[in-house]
Design a protein with these regions (language model features):
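Short, small-residue-biased leader/transition segments that mark boundaries at the very start
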Residues: 1-6
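A composition-biased, non-transmembrane "mature-region" signal
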Residues: 7-14
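Glycine-rich, often proline-containing surface loops adjacent to acidic residues and nearby aromatics
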Residues: 16, 61-77, 123-134
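A glycine-rich, hydrophobic loop/mini-helix early in the fold
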Residues: 20-71
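Short, conserved charged micro-motifs
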Residues: 28-31, 77-83, 138-150
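Aromatic/basic-lined ligand-recognition segments
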Residues: 47-55, 111-130
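Short, internal acidic amphipathic alpha-helical interface segments
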Residues: 80-118
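Mixed-charge, glycine-accented linear interaction segment located at domain edges/termini
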Residues: 130-170
Length: 170
């Protein structure tokens, strides 16, 4: 689900625009915003992607173009182990198409929340990915960077991390 358009910081590039979206089910209403331990939280993923353009070739990008993205992804508490960051990173990279292969860089953060007091016993886990990459120029229909393909790839990755109720039934 498309949520809103984002605009770039003038310190990053001359031009830029991005989109924010979410995937999943908000079946339990406000349980996601209430926080820890909700089933709804395990079925929501959010993220954004921004396409940046600099008039002058950026040496650190090796291009005029750069994509910057963020995702907050669901994670089953039992899946929170030392292998998780690498698995999420590898899965994410499988969704990229039309990019400079050596240009992908970023971080994966896995969180574990433990509640206390009146919320005692509630735990939840999550994963956050911050990543940037250089898209290939000339892949779009008009011979420029295909921004739509970059957005579709990022959205497909985020959606792939959601477990829907029908998945649980099988």
């Amino acid at each position: 689900e498309f949520r809103r358009v984002l605009f770039r910081s003038s310190t990053l590039a001359d031009y830029g625009i991005g989109v924010e979206f979410e995937a999943g089910e908000r079946a339990l209403g406000d349980a996601f915003s209430a926080g820890l331990g909700s089933d709804a939280e395990s079925r929501i993923a959010t993220g954004w992607i921004m396409m940046l353009y600099a008039h002058e070739l950026r040496i650190d990008w090796d291009s005029n173009w750069r994509c910057v993205a963020f995702a907050r992804l669901p994670l089953e508490t039992a899946e929170n182990d030392s292998l998780t960051p690498g698995m999420y990173w590898d899965d994410m990279c499988d969704y990229f198409d039309g990019i400079e292969p050596d240009s992908v860089s970023g971080t994966v953060t896995v969180t574990q929340n433990t509640a206390f007091g009146s919320m005692a016993g509630s735990t939840s886990a999550g994963c956050e990915i911050r990543v940037s990459w250089t898209p290939l120029d000339g892949t779009g229909p008009d011979g420029t960077m295909d921004a739509g393909a970059q957005v579709r790839s990022w959205a497909a990755f985020i959606r792939s991390t959601i477990r829907f109720e029908e998945d649980d039934a099988s």
